[in-house]
Amino acid sequence: MFEFFMETAPATTTGLPLSAILAIFFSFIIGIVFGGMALFVFRGFIMNRQLRIAQRKATKMLADSKLEAKDVLVEAKREADKTRNSAETELKERRSELAKQENRVIQKTEALDRKLENLEQREQSLTNREKSIDETQSQIEEIRENELKRLEEVANMTTEQAKTSLLEMLEGEMQQETSRRLREWEIKIKAEADEKAREVVSQAIQRCASDVVTETTTNVVPLPSDEMKGRLIGREGRNIRALEQATGVDLIIDDTPEAVTISSFDPVRREVARQALSKLIIDGRIHPARIEEVVTKAKEEVEAAMIASGEQAAYQAGVHGLRPEIIKVMGRLKYRTSYGQNVLQHSIEVAQMSGMIGSELGVNVTLARRAGFLHDIGKAVDRDVEGTHTQIGADMVKQWEKSPEVIKGVAEHHFDTPTVSIWGFIVSAADAISSARPGARRESLENYIKRLKALEEIADSFKGVEKSFAIQAGREVRIMVKPDEIDDLGAMRLARDIVKRIEDGLEYPGQIKVTVIRETRSVDFAK
C-alpha cells in the first residue's frame, strides 16, 4: 500500500513526493502506537513487580506478627504459671503455719488440762495430808505427855532434877568446846609466827595483777535477723550439718531471737566455729562448699592468732628465746580456762611471780620466769594426750628445753613427782598465789549449787528443823526450828551438832557460820 501511494502521489511544493510524506506520517503513527503498547506493557510489568513485592512484605509482616503473638502468648503463659506456683506455695506455707499453730494450741490446751488435773490432785493430796498431820500431831502430844510421865516414874526424877542433870552435862560439853577453841587459837598464834617468811610472797603479790575471764563452754553469735537461721540450717539441714562436721562443734538454733549458740568443750574449735560463722553471715553465701572454704580459712587465722598470742604472752612474762613450737603451743592456752581463770594469763602471772620470788631468794631469775611461764603447757594438749598436765608438760619441755631447772620446775610444781629442787617450790608457790588470790578462780556453778544443797540437807536431816537456808554464798546456814520440839538449850546443842556434821562431811574454804533461830509467839486477848 505504501508503494501504491508512493507511485500515485503527486509531488508537493517542497519537492518531496506525497507518498514519502504519508510514509513518514504512518511511521510516526505506528511508532506512537507501538510506543504506547510498550509503555502499557512496561507499566504492567512494573505494577506486577510492585504487587509481588507488596505481597512478600505482607506475607513477612503476617509471619512476624504470628511469631510475636506466639512469643507474647508463651510469656503470658509463663507468667501465669509462675504466679500460680507462687500462689500455691504461699497457700501451702500458710496452711502449714496454720496447722502448726493449731497443733501448738492443742498442745497448750492439753498441757493446761494436765496441769489443772495435777493441781486438783495436789490440792486433794494436801488436804488429806493436812488432816493426817493434825491427827499425827495430836497423837504425838498425847504420847509426849505419857512418855514424860513415864520417864519421871522410871528415872525417879522430877522435871527440875532432869534440868539440873542436863545443865551439868551441857557444862561438860562446853568445857570441851572451850578446850577445842583454845587449841584453835594456839594453832592460829603459831601460824602468825610464819608471817615473816610470807613477806616475800606478799611483796610479789602486790607487784602483780592480771585479768580473769569466766569459764564457759558456749559462744553466742548474733544474727542480723531471724531469717538468717533458715539459711544457716539450709535445705534439709545440710548447711548446719556441714558446719558441725567441719568444725566439730554443736550449733544450737532455738527460739532465742537473732542469735545462734555454739557449744563445745574444746575452746579452739569453738573459736574457729565462731569466726567462720561470723564470716558466713557477713558474706551471705552459705552452702557446704563455701562453709568448708571459710572454716579452713578460719582455722588458719586462729592458728596465726595463737602464735601471735604466744609471742605477746612471752613478751609480757619477760621470757625470751623460746622455740616456735613452744610459742604455738602456749598460744593455745589463750582459749583454755581453769575454774574461770584464763590459763595463758595465769601462766604470765606465775612467770612474773616466779621471777620475783627467785630474785628474793637469789636464784637465776631468767630460769625462774621460764619455768613459771611453761608450768601449765601440758594443759594445751591434755584433751588429746593421756596423763596429767604436769607429766605431759614435762615431756614436752624435755623435747625443746635444755635447762634441767626448767624441766624440774614444770614436773614438780604439783608434787606429782617428789619435789627435791628449789625450782619446783618456787613455781608451786607462784602457782598457788595466782590461783588462790581472791577473784582469780571460782568454782563452777554446778559444784557451787551442790555445796549449798549439801549444807541445807545436813541441816534438814536433824529432828525439829523446820526450814534451813544456805546464804552468803554458802558461808552461813540459818536454821529455823520448831519451838514446841526444841528449846533454847536444844538450839545450842543443835548448832554444835550441825557444825560437827559439816566439818566431818564437807570440804569448804574458810569458815561456815551456823545460826539456829527459835521463835516462840504467845498471843492472848484481854476481855
Swiss-Prot record:
Q: What is its main location?
A: membrane
GO cellular component terms given for this protein: plasma membrane
Carries keyword Mitochondrion? no
**Function, as annotated:** Endoribonuclease that initiates mRNA decay.
Q: Which parts pass through the membrane? A: 21-41
| Superkingdom to which the source organism belongs | Bacteria
Query: Record's InterPro entries?
Result: HD/PDEase_dom (IPR003607), HD_domain (IPR006674), HDIG_dom (IPR006675), KH_dom (IPR004087), KH_dom_type_1 (IPR004088), KH_dom_type_1_sf (IPR036612), Ribonuclease_Y (IPR017705), RNase_Y_N (IPR022711)
Q: Which family does it belong to?
A: Belongs to the RNase Y family.
Q: Where in the cell is it found?
A: Cell membrane
Which EC numbers characterise this protein's activity in its record?
A: 3.1.-.-
Gene3D superfamilies cross-referenced by the UniProt entry: Hypothetical protein af1432 (1.10.3210.10), K Homology domain, type 1 (3.30.1370.10)
Name its species: Dehalococcoides mccartyi (strain ATCC BAA-2100 / JCM 16839 / KCTC 5957 / BAV1)
Q: Where is this region: Disordered?
A: 78-97
Any Pfam family: RNase_Y_N
For this chain's UniProt record, which GO biological process terms are given? Answer: mRNA catabolic process
Q: Which UniProt keywords apply?
A: Cell membrane, Endonuclease, Hydrolase, Membrane, Nuclease, RNA-binding, Transmembrane, Transmembrane helix
Q: Where is the HD domain?
A: 343-436
UniProt KW Transmembrane helix keyword: yes
Intrachain disulfide bonds: none
| Protein's name in the database | Ribonuclease Y
- Membrane topology field: Single-pass membrane protein
Q: Extract one GO molecular function annotation from the record.
A: RNA binding
**Residue ranges annotated for the KH domain, each copy included:** 217-302
